Amino acid sequence: MKKRSFKVFTLSLQHVLAMYAGAILVPLLVGRALNVTTEQLSYLLAIDLLTCGVATLLQTLRGTYIGIGLPVMLGSSFVAVTPMIAIGSNYGIHAIYGSIIAAGVFIFLFARFFGKLTVLFPPVVTGTVVTLIGLSLVPTGVKNMAGGEKINGSANPEYGSLENLLLSVGVLVLILVLNRFLKGFARTLSVLIGIAAGTAAAAIMGKVSFSSVTEAPFFQIPKPFYFGAPAFEIGPILTMLIVGIVIIVESTGVFYAIGKICGRPLTDKDLVKGYRAEGIAILIGGLFNAFPYNTFAQNAGLLQLTKVKTRNIVVTAGCILVCLGLIPKIAALASAVPAAVLGGATVVMFGMVIASGVKMLSTADLKNQYHLLTIACSIALGIGASTAPGIFAEFPAPIRILVSDGTITGSLTAIFLNLFFSLRDKKELTAQQTELPVLEHTLALEKEV
């Protein structure tokens, strides 16, 4: 019995380690961009881990109305990073959490509706969305490689210094080397090993402060509305609703992938229960001032690698995350990681997000001219909106935030163009089916003559 318990714990810890780096990146990126205090950043990291655990349990424990019942793990969504920073910069941090609460309620209430719309999210759409998410995050990773543009709201005098660039490139190279020579589970730890080694090197260089660790309490009960009462603004809410739809699209692909790994065909009812669980997870994130959550693809890869597909492993992993979230000192360790080290690691991860999107696009019919037009226009408009934000300066603030985020602009373009061209395809197919009997009849008459 003890041997079995140890095996379950070890396999569960493996799942936690596989997603840990990705889970803590979002609070680090958002917290630093919004210039929160060290104490507030420690809270964001702790509550993020706790909410990841709760969200995982909600999704894994198959209920009558909630939870898809697959061994899936949830983490903070990368697609929410840029919109959260934009909302926080324009409306304040309170508007961020008001919009997240609204998005969670929206997804929960309309889960059944989304369950009937999965045909609108083929690989040409999901692949484009995931590719845009990666492309939108890469600039943040590169800026962190240079040391981060700002420190506590002030310009960083060491931005672009040789030390920062060498440190970040060293982390990047180490991760690549580990991926080349390590195998199995050890390879899945390459990002964490790179971050740990980079932080150790930065500490030797005098670039690391552990004051946040010493100041953080050993135990902390999560506080609803840690940053104060949420503010409900129409612009941020619309933006976060779109983020929620993009999260649904992304999670749908992961649900199907894990269902295939586990040999369990998914029904519309299963998807609806999965969407409800994600809606509740996002709502909890808003109430406790955390983040929107979605299903993590890296854990699907780990399931494929280990061949261990039992739900109790992931349930235990969710419990481990909850425990970690109740111990702020552990969370504070992550806040001590220098921006340059984080940048070296995130560039790899964000690049992998792009690669995942390209892989999804490769499963689409790229001989179809309409698919190529959908991909081309969506990515072009998405990148354009991100790189030339000034073009929307004259727009009202709510609309400006919505359209200036490249991921949202590109995702909406992909969804609408796919729908438009799908209707065109159906009309052409109907026309061909109508013309075919006429053609056959004509040929028959010619043959008789």
UniProtKB/Swiss-Prot annotation:
Q: Can you supply a Gene Ontology BP term from the record?
A: xanthine transport
Q: Does this entry carry the keyword Cell division? A: no
Pfam family name, one: Xan_ur_permease
Q: Name one GO molecular function term.
A: xanthine transmembrane transporter activity
Please give an example of a GO cellular component term from this record: plasma membrane
Residues crossing the lipid bilayer are: 11-31, 41-61, 67-87, 91-111, 119-139, 158-178, 191-211, 229-249, 277-297, 313-333, 334-354, 372-392, 401-421
User: Which InterPro entries does this one have?
Assistant: NCS2, UacT-like, Xan_ur_permease
Subcellular localization(s) per the UniProt record = Cell membrane
Q: How does it sit in the membrane?
A: Multi-pass membrane protein
Q: Enumerate the UniProt keywords alphabetically.
A: Cell membrane, Membrane, Transmembrane, Transmembrane helix, Transport
PROSITE patterns under this entry?
Answer: XANTH_URACIL_PERMASE (PS01116)
The induction comment states: Expression is very low in excess nitrogen (glutamate plus ammonia) and is induced by TnrA during limiting-nitrogen conditions (glutamate). Expression is further induced when allantoin or uric acid are added during limiting-nitrogen conditions.
Query: What is the role of this chain?
Result: Uptake of uric acid.
Similarity field:
Belongs to the nucleobase:cation symporter-2 (NCS2) (TC 2.A.40) family.
> What name does this protein carry?
Uric acid permease PucJ
